[in-house]
Amino acid sequence: MIDSVKLRRDCAADFFSHYEYLCALQDSVPLPAVRACLRDGVLDFNADRLRAVDWAPLLSTLRVNRDLPLVAIKSSFQPWLGETVLRSGGADTHRICRNRVPAVRSKDISFQLCKALRGCLSVSGVLRNLELNGLILRERDLTSLTKGLSKSTSLVHLSLANCPIGDGGLEIICQGIKNSVTLKTVNFTGCNLTWQGACHMAKILKYQTMRRHEETWAESLRYRRPDLDCMAGLRRITLNCNTLIGDQGASAFADSLSEDLWLRALDLQQCGLTSEGAKALLEALETNRTLVVLDIRKNPLIDHSMMKAVIKKVLQNGRSADSEYQWVTSPSSKEPSKTAKQRKKTIVLGSSRKGKATIRIGLATKKPSSNGRKQGLGKDCYAPNPLPPGASGFLPWRTAERAKRSRSSSLIKTRDLSNHLKKSDFPVTVTVESPSSSETDETEDSSESVQEAPQKTSIKEETLQEKLEECLRQLKEERVIRLKADKRVSELEHENAQLRNINFSLSEALHAQSLTNMILDDEGVLGSIENSFQKFHAFLDLLKDAGLGQLATMAGIDQSDFHLLGRPQMNSTVNTPIQEQKALEDETLHPKQTATGQMQDIRFQKITSDALIPLPLNTVQDPASAQEAVGASRDHLGVVGLEQQEGSAAGFIAKTGSPLAGGIPGGRSQREEEVLSKHSRSSSEKGSTASEPSRRPSAERHPRKDLLSDADPPGNSESKGPGDRRSLLNEPIKSESLKKCISIKKENRIVTVSSKTIKSKPNLLEHSESDTLGSDFELQERVHSSAHLT
């Protein structure tokens, strides 16, 4: 047991011895591909050459190793590359893959490899470089590898170049990178990363920057100067050949680089950057003075001037820095080398019956099998590897020399020529072949092709030169056209801006106008306005008919406003005849007209119609004006005085009593009188609610007319003559009770007239007769009551 423990310790210290021991246990031989670099103390091999059974001893040795400073495992297997093969049945071709799939491509082998690397990273204190190139690493493989990265105490460089881990795999790896205290450089070239992967790396930079600032603050206490180079964190990030990083990834790096003081190199070759991404990086360099390498070459979308400005700014930062971080060699096209394929030249030395000597100058390839004799040039071309004596195939040097002489006897003449050609850089092969017609034709054709080749090349060069000149000329024309087009576009944009401003101002004006016209465009609003004007002018017509034109003039209404709409005037409910209006105007102009003239006017009104009395609309009278109107009516009736009225009251009642008593026809029944009285009362009640304000002016204007027309019944008014009427009018009012009776009668008369105006014209005469009968009957009753009171 103790010997086994000692053996494991010794094997951990010596990789090669432990690997040989494990191979001997399974009856296998250590692979030459693995042993090749072990002499230098590193493990570097091509994983495609190992079979599945060869991986077990290697991984077991790697898991416990502690002395290897570098582990590099590579795979160049490309399954999409095949070989073109002709089918047996026809000319169709297809690609087949003749190479077997290596064992490292399997899930189990890759997982076991990552577990072995995790163990090596955990226990080794000298492993500084870990390179995995072209391996297929899955999620669980990366998770296992990340655990080893976080535990490593010596790893400085990590490379996963050409491993298609993608953004998800990089995110897993970043979990181990951000907590590593020794890792300084990472290489993710060709890992199928996008701008999201670049964002993951930018977050790692920000995280490490925060931790470094904390360490810097701690190291700066007591006036100490912190050493930034000795702090942990990444110093170089290589993301070449990830074309999907683009400007978004460059912007993410620019954001993190603006405050970073530790990153020294950032490689972004062939990452799909444009001038916008380069501009963002250039802005970050304005504040970052520690970045000495920012490689954005091989990005054709970046403007040449922008790339030059970025590189110039980076070189200014690197003047005072050391040369620890160098620019990565740009992946350029392979230069022609000695192994490149060259055109073969054939020189015919001569021909005879026995044969011809042919010299081919060019790349020495495998000689196809032929029936002709092929011999070497002699001593200069014959250099066999020396074999130890006793080995199979051993030939003494003297015997070999005699064989050379016998072979070179037929080529003595060509030896001098071959020595002359050997001075050149081209390999020379000299063969002697038997003459044949086909070979002679081939020789002639080849000689002709040697002469025609330079001519064809010169013709092609001239053609290409002409095309180049034509393209340059077209490019110049296109540039001129482009400048004109840009100028025209700028002019059109200016005109478009002006037209847009004009359109905006016009739209605002139209909008304001539409708001004002929107109300007037409505038919309902126009109709309501028209109706309001019609009602207003009708009201003005009523004022004019009522004789209140002066009131309208005082209110500021011009006489031209009357009859504005050209429609018939809206008079009172019953139109007054022209003669009646003239009679009323005469009464107002001549207040002291004789009683005979007044009686004739009243008689004329009774004959035509009782409903033709105009209704004044001066309803807004104050009590003072009402009293003045009453006084004026008394003056028109010729009232002499209060004493004379009281003295002649009894005589007036005696004179008028018999006619009033006899004025009622004897043939009327009691029922007919009740109906008439009820009708008169109902009409008076209806009219009192509508025309109460207009009662007093009408009653005061015509007190005598109401008295005389109501005092005489319709039957007796025709029988009486003009003389009786005059005597009746000329008698004075002698008592106060008669005044009350007259005022009550005037009010009833106004009520009857207002009730007539509400009803229609066909029933006008009928209502007037009933009102006259009712009013006569009431007058008789009130006269009798006043007589009893006196």
Swiss-Prot record:
Pfam families: LRR_6
Keywords tagged on the record: Cell projection, Cilium, Cilium biogenesis/degradation, Coiled coil, Cytoplasm, Cytoskeleton, Phosphoprotein
UniProt entry tagged with the keyword Membrane: no
GO BP of this protein: cilium organization; flagellated sperm motility; negative regulation of protein ubiquitination; protein localization to centrosome; protein localization to cilium
Segments for region (Disordered): 325-345, 362-385, 428-462, 654-732, 756-790
UniProt note: phenotype after gene disruption: Male mice are sterile due to aberrant sperm morphology and almost null sperm motility. Sperm flagella show impaired microtubule arrangements and elongated centrioles. Mice also display defects in retina and outer hair cells of the cochlea.
Coiled coil: 455-510
GO terms under cellular component: centriole; centrosome; ciliary basal body; cytoplasm
Main location: cytoplasm
UniProt-annotated location(s): Cytoplasm, Cytoskeleton, Microtubule organizing center, Centrosome; Cytoplasm, Cytoskeleton, Microtubule organizing center, Centrosome, Centriole; Cytoplasm, Cytoskeleton, Cilium basal body
Chain intervals with Low complexity compositional bias: 428-438
List of residues that carry Phosphoserine: S330, S332
Tissue: Expressed by photoreceptor cells in the retina.
SMART domains membership: LRR_RI
Family named by the database record: Belongs to the CEP78 family.
Subunit and interaction comment: Interacts with PLK4. Interacts with FAM161A. Interacts with IFT20; regulating IFT20 stability and localization. Interacts with TTC21A; regulating TTC21A stability and localization. Interacts with USP16; promoting USP16-dependent deubiquitination of tektins. Interacts with DCAF1/VPRBP; promoting localization of the EDVP complex to centrosomes. Interacts with CEP350; promoting CEP78 localization to centrosome and centriole.
Function: Centriole wall protein that localizes to mature centrioles and regulates centriole and cilia biogenesis. Involved in centrosome duplication: required for efficient PLK4 centrosomal localization and PLK4-induced overduplication of centrioles. Involved in cilium biogenesis and controls cilium length. Acts as a regulator of protein stability by preventing ubiquitination of centrosomal proteins, such as CCP110 and tektins. Associates with the EDVP complex, preventing ubiquitination and degradation of CCP110.
Protein name according to UniProt: Centrosomal protein of 78 kDa
Lineage: Eukaryota, Metazoa, Chordata, Craniata, Vertebrata
